[in-house]
């Protein structure tokens, strides 16, 4: 068993320690006797209430989820907050680096730039992909070609912005987070979620 698998099993064990009825109420989850259900970046997932395993919907079938970033983001979302009542979202958006002291967060520039280049010249395709994932287009901010509020988890959204490139400037992506986001996720998990969202958009536009 590699380190990733060990951490996934640790996530399962952590999830199983929680009062699932409280999680259902806290996050408004659909549920039955065997599973809890939630949507993550446009895909339906279910969590086995007995062993914590996560599966995703593929048509009429359910498939074991082996994507480390997806699994750990779902576990973290459900188990991160020790607060019985979560703070309401403020609608005040900020970059992820604002949550930490200067110089202490890893740079995501090369990672994000890869997706920005892939999206270059495809504003309409990116727009349609965001809509396909449940995104709601909002007013343009800071001159971005696209600004979308993207629902990524139950009642939890991020703001996705894309500037297409031209002769003077390269394409650019910026993800913004509500200022209370770290009441819902650990800081490290925001990087998993960001990667999963950009990957999902790219898969749709091809």
Label the predicted regions.
Residues 1-34, 40, 70, 77-134:
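Short Lys/Arg-enriched alpha/beta "domain-start" segment
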Residues 24-50, 139-164:
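Amphipathic, interaction-prone secondary-structure segments
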Residues 44-69, 163-188:
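Intrinsically disordered, low-complexity regulatory segments enriched in Ser/Thr/Pro
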Residues 45, 100, 111-116, 142-144, ...:
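Domain-length accessory/inserted modules outside core catalytic folds
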Residues 64, 116, 146, 150:
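Short, charged/polar micro-motifs that form catalytic or ligand-binding hotspots
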Residues 74, 78, 194-197:
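Short amphipathic C-terminal alpha-helix that caps PH/PH-like domains
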Residues 121-183:
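Conserved binding-pocket/active-site segment within a compact domain
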Residues 178-206:
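A recognition module on extended beta-rich or small alphabeta surfaces enriched in W/G with H and D/E
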């Amino acid at each position: 068993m590699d380190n990733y698998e060990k951490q996934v099993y640790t996530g399962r064990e952590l999830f199983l320690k929680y009062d699932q009825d409280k999680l259902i109420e806290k996050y408004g989850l659909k549920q039955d006797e065997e599973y809890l259900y939630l949507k993550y970046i446009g895909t339906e997932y279910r969590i086995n209430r007995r062993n914590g395993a996560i599966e995703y919907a593929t048509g009429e079938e359910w498939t074991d989820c082996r994507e480390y970033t997806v699994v750990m983001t779902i576990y973290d979302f459900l188990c991160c907050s020790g607060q019985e009542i979560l703070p309401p979202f403020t609608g005040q958006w900020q970059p992820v680096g604002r949550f930490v002291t200067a110089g202490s967060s890893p740079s995501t520039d090369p990672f994000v730039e890869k997706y920005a280049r892939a999206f270059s010249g495809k504003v309409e395709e990116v727009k349609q992909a965001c809509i396909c994932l449940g995104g709601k287009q909002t007013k343009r901010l800071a001159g971005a070609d696209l600004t979308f509020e993207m629902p990524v988890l139950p009642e939890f959204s991020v703001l996705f912005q894309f500037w297409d490139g031209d002769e003077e400037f390269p394409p650019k992506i910026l993800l913004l987070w509500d200022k209370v986001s770290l009441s819902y996720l650990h800081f490290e998990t925001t990087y998993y979620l960001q990667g999963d969202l950009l990957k999902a958009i790219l898969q749709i536009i091809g």
